[in-house]
């Protein structure tokens, strides 16, 4: 089952050299402090991002708070799933339904963990096919789409 999470992208903290982990931990501590009023399950580092999971459905409200933490570039509301294609395809449909009005979309898959058997192009096709079935009146548009569905395969 897909869990709603916040995927935190950060600024120049990621450019630091040997002390990068130290700065990432400081940023994680600052995020935890900012989210003291929320029921946070975990704040963890994954492949150049910080993942914040919750015990309750609080990701939408928490994203607004996380955006105010110094060092945070942006916060994406996301769904965390297993590597099961049915799970991540269902999460993609759910995410696109939540997007709001749109006429065109694009799928952009990225794998930082290359031990997964599907390539990024395979994932694009697989998720795109499911989205085309779920939204038959919407167009796939590679350049300047109204909505973009990102699929990240990490750790």
Predicted feature descriptions by range:
Residues 1-155:
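RNA-binding accessory domains that recognize and position tRNA/RNA substrates
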